[in-house]
């Protein structure tokens, strides 16, 4: 009788412990989803403003290649969520690597806004992101954040961390 009673208490404690863990996991997943949705909404709204600025550029209007570089959170849009998301959820939809960052902007602008930018080659993106001209450019929304570098319309959202 004692072992049955101990077993039932053990099962009850185990079940309660698992329920607490499951609830914590569900809360964390919801926090992460809320943070990622807010980040995406912020970036899409920013992308809309960036495209509006690009459309004013004569080289863009003439079909020049375009590259958008930088993470909004490293520029004018730093973000700290009070929801305490997991570390990977805080990365946002854009990479810190210049090539993947540029590709992320191309995909985001096309998927969310229906605007197809004239992409440039990965080697060109790397060359521009490492150039002194790019490093000297101000970040969006300052005047001069859009410049033509080596024939590519370059829009600088933020500096890269390296």
Where are these regions (language model features)?
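Signature aromatic-anchored transmembrane alpha helix within multi-pass, membrane-resident enzymes
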Residues: 2-28
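Intrinsically disordered, polar/acidic, low-complexity terminal segments
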Residues: 22-162
């Amino acid at each position: 009788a004692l072992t049955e009673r101990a077993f039932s208490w053990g099962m009850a404690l185990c079940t309660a412990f698992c329920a607490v863990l499951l609830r914590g996991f569900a809360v964390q997943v919801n926090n992460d989803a809320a943070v990622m949705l807010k980040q995406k909404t912020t970036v899409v709204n920013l992308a809309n403003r960036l495209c509006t600025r690009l459309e004013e550029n004569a080289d863009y209007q003439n079909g020049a290649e375009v590259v958008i570089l930088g993470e909004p959170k490293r520029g004018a849009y730093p973000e700290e969520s009070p929801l305490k998301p997991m570390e990977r959820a805080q990365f946002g939809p854009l990479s810190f690597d210049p090539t993947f960052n540029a590709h992320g902007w191309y995909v985001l602008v096309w998927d969310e806004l229906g605007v197809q930018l004239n992409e440039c080659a990965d080697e060109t993106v790397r060359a521009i992101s490492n150039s002194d001209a790019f490093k000297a450019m101000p970040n969006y929304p300052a005047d001069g954040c859009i410049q033509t570098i080596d024939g590519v319309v370059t829009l600088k959202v933020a500096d890269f961390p390296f």
